[in-house]
Regions:
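Extracellular and secretory-pathway beta-repeat/beta-biased strand scaffolds
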Residues: 1-195
Length: 195
């Protein structure tokens, strides 16, 4: 999938999960009137879970073991509660910006083999209730799973970088700014900081 230009919700804010197992390329995209956005190269399936009193809760399960997300030099931006990038590998070569000013607003990059479960009941205006739950896979790799290229910049209230493949690493040649919250990096491989 190639995403270029504006993506807008006409009407109330909504959450979006966009999936393509063959890969996703974003270059010059702006997301407007979304609550949370997830881009993933995983395979989707729906799962209904019985709750108390006969209530059924639906989850979108995403199983990721292939594919790459690439953010091009014209970048990606949005005013979002959450931005989730989920792929076997992620490369950022331009500005990646979450403009929402809350300290809980985040960009989370999850690279490697993983399973994610999205709660479809999560409100697109609620930044306190979790939207997605992750479970790492069992894969091993010595590759660079997440690369932030020279001249690129990742900006959000919080930035979370998670590499699930054992031995896979992170290489940052750009700039990362967690402007209002915290910065988290989890990887068992090499972490190279050059920016």
């Amino acid at each position: 999938s190639r995403i270029q230009g504006d993506m807008d919700v006409v009407g109330p804010r909504a959450n979006l999960i966009l999936a393509n197992q063959n890969g996703i390329s974003v270059n010059g995209a702006n997301f407007s009137n979304f609550g949370s956005v997830a881009l993933t190269t995983g395979a989707l399936s729906l799962r209904d879970q019985q709750q108390s009193e006969g209530q059924v809760q639906r989850y979108v399960d995403v199983s990721t073991n292939q594919g790459r997300i690439h953010i091009g030099d014209e970048g990606m931006a949005g005013n979002l509660i959450r931005l989730e990038l989920i792929a076997r590998s992620i490369q950022v070569d331009g500005p990646l910006t979450n403009e929402f000013t809350s300290s809980s607003a985040h960009i989370r990059m999850v690279a490697g083999e993983s399973t994610a479960s999205f709660d479809t009941a999560a409100s697109p205006v609620d930044n306190l209730t979790p939207w997605v739950y992750y479970k790492p896979g069992q894969a091993q790799s010595n590759e660079v799973a997440i690369k932030v290229g020279a001249g690129s910049k990742v900006t959000a209230g919080q930035i979370q970088i998670l590499v699930t493949d054992k031995g896979a690493g992170v290489r940052n040649e750009g700039e990362m700014v967690a402007s209002a919250g915290g910065f988290t990096l989890s990887s068992t491989g090499d972490v190279v900081q050059m920016g």
